Curated annotation (Swiss-Prot):
Positions that bind ATP: L25, R26, G67, K70, T71, S72, E133, D134, F135, R176, Y186, R223
Region listing for Head domain (RuvB-H), in residue ranges: 260-345
Cross-referenced PANTHER family: HOLLIDAY JUNCTION BRANCH MIGRATION COMPLEX SUBUNIT RUVB, PTHR42848
UniProt name for this protein: Holliday junction branch migration complex subunit RuvB
Predominant subcellular localization, coarse grouping: cytoplasm
Keywords: ATP-binding, Cytoplasm, DNA damage, DNA recombination, DNA repair, DNA-binding, Hydrolase, Nucleotide-binding
Organism phylogeny: Bacteria, Bacillati, Actinomycetota, Actinomycetes, Mycobacteriales
Binding site for DNA: R315, R320
Annotated organism of origin: Mycobacterium marinum (strain ATCC BAA-535 / M)
Subunit structure and binding partners: Homohexamer. Forms an RuvA(8)-RuvB(12)-Holliday junction (HJ) complex. HJ DNA is sandwiched between 2 RuvA tetramers; dsDNA enters through RuvA and exits via RuvB. An RuvB hexamer assembles on each DNA strand where it exits the tetramer. Each RuvB hexamer is contacted by two RuvA subunits (via domain III) on 2 adjacent RuvB subunits; this complex drives branch migration. In the full resolvosome a probable DNA-RuvA(4)-RuvB(12)-RuvC(2) complex forms which resolves the HJ.
Functional note: The RuvA-RuvB-RuvC complex processes Holliday junction (HJ) DNA during genetic recombination and DNA repair, while the RuvA-RuvB complex plays an important role in the rescue of blocked DNA replication forks via replication fork reversal (RFR). RuvA specifically binds to HJ cruciform DNA, conferring on it an open structure. The RuvB hexamer acts as an ATP-dependent pump, pulling dsDNA into and through the RuvAB complex. RuvB forms 2 homohexamers on either side of HJ DNA bound by 1 or 2 RuvA tetramers; 4 subunits per hexamer contact DNA at a time.
Entry text on domains: Has 3 domains, the large (RuvB-L) and small ATPase (RuvB-S) domains and the C-terminal head (RuvB-H) domain. The head domain binds DNA, while the ATPase domains jointly bind ATP, ADP or are empty depending on the state of the subunit in the translocation cycle. During a single DNA translocation step the structure of each domain remains the same, but their relative positions change.
Name of the gene encoding the protein in the UniProt record: ruvB
Pfam families: AAA_lid_4 (PF17864), RuvB_C (PF05491), RuvB_N (PF05496)
Length: 345
């Protein structure tokens, strides 16, 4: 049975259920932002340098997997600069005119945030080049031989672009960002701090051991950690006394099919098919997807990245292969010759 990737509790993508709660949990300053110490230090220098000069910072590109806080950092950058934030996304900018309208409404020192900037349409991207470099755009009026280009000045602004696929950016666009930061997955200890902060904001009684239990199942992603915290809260309020202990957390996550390594039903189905149906592989992703009743894109884009990062699946020229860790996680004996990478190697 096909699964909507956004319905998974361990999906790093923003879901409808995250909504207003996700907004309420966002940090509002670099001091409040947990994790990514190197990125925070670098951004602090970029922001403070611009404030000292009384100018606008260089354009900033934030890259990394979904759910790590790129949008939160864009909001923080604007707040730290004391500037207004204008938000849009790459898919929303289908025409150059869409971008021109947004740029013409900017005032000096505004921060323009474009999420999924790698998906911006080519005509809009080409207009963005000139705006980023010279703070102007050329608007074409008319068609055919009679068309004329009218230059329009744009107020000096800072573009913050966010992408989960930095390699998909064109060279000319990437080169126009003065500062690029890559965000890494969080360590369990950092996620535990995120959970403690979120629990305080939401008024949740969270035991220390319970925070650690949820953190290690959160795939290194704060958005997943906060979502699991809300699901465990529901369980604690309905089936316990409202206090989240380690045992309550374990019982709740078992109900939601999230195991001790953060794998859910779909992840385990992929591993089970790979080991039991295909003897560990190699097997092509399309064949593997048919075996679990999913789209190939779901297996490749939703399940596989975490399974590879966790050291349970290896990509080879001949197809996907289950590692020794995948066999042992399913309670099976690895066949002779299975490689044995450590977790997250």
């Amino acid at each position: 049975m096909s699964t909507d990737p956004d319905e998974r509790e361990v999906s790093p993508a923003l879901t409808v259920g995250d909504g207003d709660v996700d907004v309420s949990l966002r940090p509002r300053s670099l001091r409040e932002f947990i994790g990514q110490p190197r990125v925070r230090e670098q951004l602090q220098l970029v922001i403070q340098g611009a404030k000292n000069r009384g100018g606008t910072p260089d354009h900033i590109l934030l890259s990394g997997p979904p759910g790590l806080g790129k949008t939160s950092l864009a909001m923080i950058i604007a707040a730290e600069l004391g500037s207004s934030l204008r938000m849009t996304s790459g898919p929303a900018l289908e025409r150059a005119g869409d971008l021109a309208a947004m740029l013409s409404n900017l005032v000096e020192h505004d921060v323009l945030f474009i999420d999924e900037i790698h998906r911006i349409a080519r005509p809009a991207e080409e207009m963005l080049y000139l705006a980023m470099e010279d703070f102007r755009v050329d608007v074409v009026v008319g068609k055919g031989p009679g068309a004329t280009s009218i230059p329009l000045d744009v107020a000096p602004f800072t573009l913050v672009g966010a992408t989960t696929r930095s390699g998909a950016l064109t060279g000319p666009l990437r080169d126009r960002f003065g500062f690029t930061a890559h965000m890494d997955f969080y360590e369990p200890a950092e996620l535990e701090r995120v959970l403690v902060r979120s629990a305080g904001i939401l008024g949740i009684q969270l035991g220390a051991d319970a925070g650690a239990e949820i953190a290690r199942r959160s795939r290194g992603t704060p958005r997943i950690a906060n979502r699991l915290l809300r699901r465990v809260r529901d369980f604690a309020e309905v089936r316990a006394d409202g206090v989240i202990t380690r045992d309550v957390a374990k019982a709740a996550l078992a109900v939601y099919d999230v195991d001790e390594l953060g794998l859910d039903r779909l992840d385990r189905a992929v591993l089970s098919a790979l080991t039991r149906s295909f003897s560990g592989g190699p097997v092509g992703v399309s064949t593997l997807a048919v075996a679990v009743g999913e789209e190939a894109s779901t297996v490749e884009e939703v399940c596989e990245p975490f399974l590879v990062r966790a050291g349970m699946v290896a990509r080879t020229p001949r197809g996907r292969v289950a590692t020794a860790l995948a066999w042992t996680h399913l309670g099976m004996t690895p066949p002779a010759g299975a490689n044995q990478p450590g977790l997250f190697e």
